[in-house]
Amino acid sequence: MAVEEKNSPTGAAMTNTGILVPSSQQSLPEWWTKTQKFFSRENTITPTFGYFRLLFGTQPGKTDIALIVIGTIAGIGAGIPFPLLGILFGELVDDLNSSTCSTTQAPPGGYQAAITTKVLQVIYVSILNFVCMYIHTGCWSMVGERLVRRLRTKYFHSLLRQEIAFTDTLPSGDVTSRLVSDIEVIQAGTSEKVGLFIGTISYFVAAYIVAFLKVATIAAMLMSVVPIYFLMAFGGGHYIKKYSGRISTHINAATSIVSSSLSHMSIVHAFNANARLEALFAQHLVSARMDALKKAITHSIQFGMLYFVAYASNALAFWQGSRMIADLAEGKPSKVSVGAVYTVIFVLLDASFVLSQMAPFMHIFASAASAGDRLMTTIKRQSAIDGTSSEGDSTISLASEEIELQDVTFNYPARPEVPVLQGVSFKIPPNKHTAIVGTSGSGKSTVVALLERLYDPITGCVRVGNRDLKEINVRHLRGSIGLVQQEPNLLDRSILENIAHGLVSSSQEKHKHLLPTLLGPSLSELTEKIRQGASEDEAVTEQGDVVREIVNLTRHAATLSNAIDFINALPDGLATRVGSSGAELSGGQKQRIALARALIRDPPVLLLDEATAALDSTSERLIQAALNKVSENVTTVSIAHRLATAKDADNIIVMQKGRVMEQGTHMDLVARDGVYAGMVRLQNIGKFSSSSSIMTESTQVDANIDRSLTTDTLLNKEEKLSLEQGVLDEKEKPAQLYMPEEADSLPTEPENEKEKPKQTLWATMKGSFPLIRPNILLISLGLITSIMIGVSYTGEAVIFGHTVGSLSVCRGGPSIRSSGMLFGLLFFILAIVKFAAVIVNGAAFGWAAEKTLYRTRVLSLRSLLRQPLEWHNADGRTPGLLVALVTSDASALSSLTGTTIGVLFSTVANLFAGVILSHVIAWKIAVVLLATLPVLLASGVLRLRVMAQYQKKHQKAYAKATAITVESVDNIKSIAAFSLEQEAYSVFNRSLKAPYKSNMKSVLHGNFWLSLAYSISTLVYALAYWWGSQQILAGMYTQVQFFIVLPALLFSTQSCGQMFALVPDISKARIAASNIVDLLSIKHEGDEEYDKTGSKASAKHTDPRFNMLEDKPRDVEAQLITTTPSSFPTKGMGVQFRNVHFRYPSRPNQPALDDLSINISPGQFCALVGPSGSGKSTTFALLEKFYNPASGSIIIDGVDITKQSGAAFRDTIALVPQENVMFEGTVAFNIGLGARPDVEATQEEIEEACRLANIHDTIAALPDGYNTVCSQDGKQFSGGQRQRLSIARALVRKPRLLLLDESTSALDVESEKHVQDALAKVARKTTIVAIAHRLNTIHRADRIFMIEGGRCVDQGTHAELVERCESYRANVIHQSLDA
């Protein structure tokens, strides 16, 4: 069903396919369209045009065109007044020269009237300059804001429509880097600085026009140096762009480590892995540091050469001008006057000075162009499988068509050398149940991905009926399929919105009318009202009938998936937010939500990839019954390792190593006694029982069909349990990707953050000093050269004043020539000195900035990784926001030790030197001119305050948009499978709307003060000439004194204006410093002895937060000598829970553990079983001391850990989590993370652990073996392979206590047997506590604890529980394959 086009925030229309179509494109003139196409072309134009491609290659609309044109015209207009002033000042010089050098006695009143008239003209010109500047800064600020909004939306939209293979090969951290660092760089390079740059160029061109009109000879001589300016500008820009690209690559890798670490803090804490992750992070930063230094030196050489050329050209101008004035003085024919020469020298001197200020802008523009190219590469990329496209057949029905794989071969783009499917052929009959079973990594999930067309086969094809899958519209295909993935991915929305996502692309005609509401804000507004206290019925009624229909469909789907009871038990019900990746829900609860999302669309095809792996057997049985009911006329394809869920399938396909080994019904395959029969023998609980009586009793119970346990009674039991649960049963992950706007950017005490006093500037500076202290020598060198650069302007004023005075025709020709030679030489010497000072200044500050940046980032990450889970889970803290602390905030803070602080100090030095010199030379003139400086400074300070408030207010708002993008890319398979591109795009655009509107208002306010700061110097010129002329005519001072004081003060005021252009950078640095100091000021448990990087705090530096960091961090991925125990410990840990009560901070009204008491003896193998959400994983979270219980004791080896500080006890505990996490790094590094904190695992120990986990052969078969790089979250490995890698990581620790949370849920039966055998080897030497829903995993346990509603309701051996525990016995019956 077509959807009405709606204007997107980018000024474009979005069709129902999600494709953006510029709304104003057809009305644009042809010349503009051609220009746009020219600048949009890839690889056909030189890098010089990269900046113009950034401006014009993103489909700007009419408003953007108007803003660019008006801003450009106003920028050009802003540059013209200054050369006009040169003409007026030249005429004033002629008047002054006439009054002091004339042989005739003219009345002073005549000179004064002429001077006053010209001063009034200067005031008119200054008003024109202010108007032009305000217009061009405002227009270009809006251009920049609108451009980055278009880039954000286009980049996000492009990411959404790319095929999964693209995101698989996307460098980790790339998306975060693009939307945080690159967007900031682009905004800096396309806003008000563009107008200032245009004004500079306009000034330069106008100055030369005036110069040619006045004295063409001097102008022509100086014109020859213009190419040198552009050679240095663009040549330096090329190398800056080159080094920026290299730096970006290293920073992306480092950002990925930060992002994955902050997203999986439970793993970081469980293995005390913060030191190793910090060291790997530091390695990437060190790699980036040398390129950053080269970039800084290139920039300083570029800047220094511009100064050198400017000053050298002035030396040439003075020399040539002196010769021409000497000829005039000697009576030779000449049309040149002293005022004309002064005009040329003045405007070209000033133009050269202003042009030399262009270098920082060139650096900013080059960086913006480089960042734009990186974004445009993705934006322009054509997707091989575009889920938003309207191409392909949208009429075919999958309800009655046979699906067939024909000789399919496939390998993942991330590992092209590893075959996944090899000649796979089989048929999936319509309206039948086809089950696919096999070993981990055999290609089962890949088949599902091909059926969804997330990938295309390398060879062969997938057919639906007689049509190739490639001929069918992708959106229509995916809309006809309900998918439940092996690892269910939920978006950070409410439960209602997550389930309703299944309706977005539904192929059912009855759902089409719901689409506009699903894509709009209605559901989010509904859930927000419910969370604020409104009843669901009231809120639904207010939203209308369509929303009510969606809610009813959602409730029905949740009932089918056995999720409705735990949803109703939650305080906010369907409005409950699930958190980042569903972190607020247990694994079983997430799986039921994902199943509801698939069932709500009533699809003709169901793809179930381990859809019930995280569920207990009772829940699985209930859901299986519901699936059997809804799939009567549905084509169902299921992947399962629990063969009990596959045995009733119409056809079972057995796969191994990417090939189909056999297929048939359960009975047929068992009768063949082949691969499948072997799997059955391995998995059947009874045949593995150590007690024959257990199997006998179980069979007898099954024979009697246990009529007391009907589906209805089981459902009632489940409802009762669920109403008692409704709580988290997962180790909490970092908080939601969305962030409340009222939350502080970095609260340290969430419960009273509103009362937290605002940090003063002095406190921020004091807190930042330890970060800067190690680089004090470099900074001192930079400050000295900055002072030299600032004082050089005063030296220039002295030379200038004496030169102008020496050009008076009152002096003889020889005197004028010798003075011109002398002062020209002095100017050339000044050029050499300034060139050297600028290079040293840039290198010193550049190196100091990079070292400060390295130190700040490492210390920030260290502090973040040491915070407890409860801190990370507080409202207002999201992985995306915390990543920004380490990346953007650290970078902003480091600018205070880089070029920003250099410009600031040179400006201050210039100001003080100019003021002092002026008072020494002519204090009466200086005092009057100095009175204008507070006005200039006040305008700059006011702009600083405006920008600081604006920056702080909207820092979080754009972080939210970035977090949405990162979340979407992380969950791209779910978004593609359910065609949620439009929904994600709509949410993203809504997140941009508020900050965009506010930013546009801030533009008008902030740029008023910037324009005033720049323009007020012209008024100072007017006052200077008027007052100076008064003093000269009165005989108080000479022309030489006046022309020393004038440039000394006016260069100072111009420098202040330039300094205020850096106000946004200073504002960002101030806020960033406050955030980082807040972070580093948090006291940590065990601060007095903490130092995980291997260096204890010295007596001099006792604060561990600021321990000296190694410039060359250790290579954590290299093989090191180890002191890890060579064998497993001889004795396990004893564990006791005594009357433990606990509630998660995010759910204070829901008990997670309710008076839990269990006792585990050293060396025992114990198991925790029970329904999903009963509190099993919570026990592990408390055992690891991620949280402290509300009451009760947790005793490990006789020590109550709730009363102990620190977490040293974790050193001998290993955890295998329910969701297996890989970090950026090699396979060896990921497994080595499990080693104890004070040692490194050897290669032999890593391989031994992998053999125990049955993953060694898989790793060895990879081209790079153990050096294979894992992408973020290990996307290139299958679920079962990641699970075995997690087990290896735990075993390499040689723990005394091993915690297994569903550690074999994603394993095939053969791999599971290998792991069970490995665990048997370490049993009795290690205490093992396992959470499992597969009873064959734990039926040999020494003791099994039944956990229900946060309590232990029964315990005993397998045989004892089968005999007396009804729910346990029901699970055994359900999982038995003998039935």
Swiss-Prot record:
Residues holding ATP: 438-445, 1170-1177
Keyword Repressor carried by entry: no
Record carries keyword Transmembrane helix: yes
GO CC, one annotated term: mitochondrial inner membrane
GO MF terms held by the record: ABC-type oligopeptide transporter activity; ATP binding; ATP hydrolysis activity
Any coiled-coil regions, as ranges: none
Stored SMART domains: AAA
Cystine bridges: none
Subcellular location: Cell membrane
Annotated stretches, region: Disordered: 738-758
Main location per the UniProt record: membrane
Record-annotated ABC transmembrane type-1 domain positions: 69-367, 781-1068
InterPro entries in the record: AAA+_ATPase, ABC1_TM_dom, ABC1_TM_sf, ABC_transporter-like_ATP-bd, ABC_transporter-like_CS, P-loop_NTPase, Type_1_exporter
Topology within the bilayer: Multi-pass membrane protein
GO biological process: oligopeptide export from mitochondrion
Record's keyword terms, sorted: ATP-binding, Cell membrane, Glycoprotein, Membrane, Nucleotide-binding, Repeat, Transmembrane, Transmembrane helix, Transport
Up-regulation conditions: Expression is induced upon exposure to amphotericin B and the allylamine terbinafine. This induction requires the presence of MDR2.
Start and end residues of each ABC transporter domain: 403-682, 1135-1374
Assigned protein family: Belongs to the ABC transporter superfamily. ABCB family. Multidrug resistance exporter (TC 3.A.1.201) subfamily.
Role summary: Pleiotropic ABC efflux transporter that may be involved in the modulation susceptibility to a wide range of unrelated cytotoxic compounds.
Protein name: ABC multidrug transporter MDR2
Organism, scientific name: Trichophyton interdigitale (strain MR816)
Source lineage: Eukaryota, Fungi, Dikarya, Ascomycota, Pezizomycotina
Gene this chain is encoded by: MDR4
